[in-house]
Structure formats: C-alpha cells, structure tokens
Amino acid sequence: MKKYGKRVIGVILMVLAMVLTQIPMPVLEATSATADFERDGDTLIHYTGTASAVSVPAGIREIAPEAFADQNGITKVYIPSSVEKIGEGAFRNCTNLKEVSLSDGLITIESGAFAGCSSLSGFTLPKTLETIGAGVFSGDTALKSINIGKNRLFSYADGVLYDRDQAKLIEVMPGREAETLNMPTKVTDIERYAFWGQEHLKEVTLSPNLSEIPEYAFSNCINLQKVSIPYSVRKIAAKAFEDCKNLGNITIPPSVTTIHDTAFDGCDNLKIRAEDDSAAQIFEQEREKNQVVSAMLQDDVAVGNFYNKQDARYRETVQVPVIMMSIIRLMFPIWMFQNIMPMIRLPFWGRQESYTIRQL
C-alpha cells in the first residue's frame, strides 16, 4: 500500500511538472527607481533611468517640458493622481511607448506632450482633464482612436477629438484610416497641428462657420488632394498646408483676405483658383513668379557675403548669371528684393561687379 501511494504521488508530481513547463512564466520588466528622477520640489525635471516600465513618483505635481523626451527604451508609463500638469513635449519621440496610464487629478496636457510616440495605440483622458494643447498626438501613427471616458469637457467622434460642444476641432488621430472628413458645421475653430501628418486623408470639407485655417493645420498631409474652403474663412496662416505634395486645384474664395507667404510651401502640384483682384489671386501670381525664378536659378545661384565699405558691414549677396538677371529685371518690380537681397553680384566675362538693387 505504501509503495502504491508513493507511485501515485510520483505520477502526480510528474504530471504537475509537465503542466508547469507548459505555462508561460511572466517576464519581469525593468522598473524605474527613485534615483532615476531629477526633481525640483514637486516638479519632475528629467528622467535619467533606462527602465522599460516607468512609474512617476507619488507627490509629483508637474512633469516638466521634455522630461522624458527621446527615451526610446520606455514602453509603459504610469502617472499618479498627484500629477496635475504634463509639460510641452514631455514624452516627445518616445518611439517605443505603447501604454500610458493616466490618473484622475490631471488637469493640463500641454502641446506635443506625446508627439512622435509612434507605437502608442491607446489613450484614455482622465475625467479631471480640462486643457489639452496643440498636436499632443502628432506623429503617433499607431493611434487610431482614444477614449474620453467620463470626461465631460471633450467629445469624440470618427477619430476626431473636439471640445464638448464641437465648436473647436482639437486633433484628428494620426492613425485614422478614413480618406475623407466632413467637418461638423458647429466647428468655428481648428487647433494648430490638428491634421498634421495625416497619411490616409485625401479630401476635407471644412465647416461653413470656420473663420481661420491656423498654423500647421494640414501640414505634411502627403496624400491630401482636395480641400473645400468655405466663404466664412478669412485667414490662412503660416505653414497651414506645408508639404501637402498631392494637393491639386484648390478654390480660395474672396472672403480670404490674408494668406501667409508660407501657407502652401512645398505644395508642388498646387494650382489656386481665385476671383480677379482677390487676395488669393495676388498670392497665386506671386507664388507662380517665385516658382519660375526658383526653377531658373536653382543650379546657378550662389549665396555669399559682400562687404560694403560705405556702411562698413557685410550684406547678403547672391551671384546670378547675367542672362538670368536680365529676365528678373523684366519680370519683377525692384521693391520685391529690397528686404531679401540688398546686394547682387553679377559675374560676366571673367570679372565680377557689385550693384545695389537701385542701380539695376
């Protein structure tokens, strides 16, 4: 009987050992230590550790700008309820960060706080959050949607974060896969960087109550082809459509009275349609002239410095072939160069002479 009992126990132990070997054991992650954090009072200034899972120490009230920036080893972050503010770019370019756990108590997330976190695939807003800055998720290409949870100050629909009443469009999730977006008619304001880097977006219809297209709003939307601009829009700000390389024909209504010089930088295929004598028509004429000059002089212009003895200072100069200078004289008014190129050096027949713009 004793031998039989021993055999049974032996068999049980063997079976148990076999079962245990098939159960995957959890891999322990490297976690942060108190010494890994540089502090100034209740502000976390900088993280110096190498852990993959980071827990911000209790008692911290503010995470300073760029405190965790470029920390590619971090995969998880836990932020306690004591933290009220996450500073600008605090976790910028943490490219392997996949999970962020925020606690109720957080009030403010500043601009670009999680920008460039390309592995981040989920995010939940605390119910206490009151303010979220521009481009918080810019470049987070894995982020298709977020959860606003019990927060009553924000709303969310179709991959887009708005304020509570949808009067302000705050940000389109970078991983949103839809190719079109019809902006709600309630929208009167777009946050800077709201559409930045949207890879899938091809067509946008703006709200008929929108008054301005702000800085960098659609910058780097490389596949954007069509934008419908309503008569409510008065201003198109700097870099608003920068590097939208596939943006084709676009109609800008006469209601737009201000277009920044850089609004359409890098839009190689753009053709603006506008009414006669409108700000948009004037902008397009100047843009086309600049494109012609840029194409003509791209390989022939050299920029250097010229020392003017009369006022004893260096001035910026541009070396231009004589034939090109003749074309420029015919095409452009002199005032266009007064602030851009104070002196022009013209090489001809083996020697160079210097001329002021007024002498040309």
Regions found by a protein language model. Give the residues of each.
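Sec-dependent N-terminal signal peptides
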Residues: 6-18, 22
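Sec-dependent signal peptide cleavage junction
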Residues: 20-35
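GGW-centered surface loops in extracellular recognition modules
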Residues: 35-46, 307
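Consensus positions within tandem repeat domains that build extended binding/scaffold surfaces
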Residues: 65-67, 87-90, 111-113, 134-136, ...
